[in-house]
């Protein structure tokens, strides 16, 4: 978790809250960023929020950001507000169990900075050993969870 308390609804443009949340989750799980295969993005489809999250992912994961898959399931189910994090956690667990990462629907014209695998339009088969689920909430309360399957 992290709290940047930058603004009621907007993230800090430097993405430090998102970065710290993801970094802390990886540390608690005792894994390196390179272990993550899939990220269920907070991904609300807001230009600022999505760019900030994408920048934080690139900063934390470095080159590995271009090897993992990342999608926003809000594109399929909408923003469930208080329930969003739990439903997105379930999507992450299902990706591990089923070996299928969910798509980012309606991603017809991504910005130029969206140069990683955002799983556009269609689900994708992929072995997922570790998944990271991001939930970046109102007032700068950020949570990221790491999931893995049985050994």
Please describe what each predicted stretch is.
Residues 1-151:
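Conserved "HGTGT" condensation-loop signature of ketosynthase/thiolase-family condensing enzymes
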């Amino acid at each position: 978790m992290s709290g940047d308390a930058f603004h009621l609804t907007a993230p800090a443009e430097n993405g430090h809250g998102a970065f710290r949340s993801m970094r802390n989750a990886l540390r608690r799980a005792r894994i390196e960023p390179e272990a993550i295969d899939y990220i269920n993005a907070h991904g609300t489809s807001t230009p600022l929020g999505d760019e900030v999250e994408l920048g934080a992912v690139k900063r934390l994961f470095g080159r590995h950001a271009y090897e993992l898959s990342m999608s926003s399931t809000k594109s399929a189910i909408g923003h469930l507000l208080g329930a969003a994090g739990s439903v997105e956690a379930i999507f992450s667990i299902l990706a591990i169990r089923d070996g299928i990462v969910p798509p980012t629907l309606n991603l017809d014209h991504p910005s130029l900075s969206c140069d990683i695998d955002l799983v556009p339009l269609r689900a994708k088969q992929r072995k997922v050993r570790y998944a990271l689920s991001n939930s970046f909430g109102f007032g700068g309360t950020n949570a990221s969870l790491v999931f893995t399957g049985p050994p």
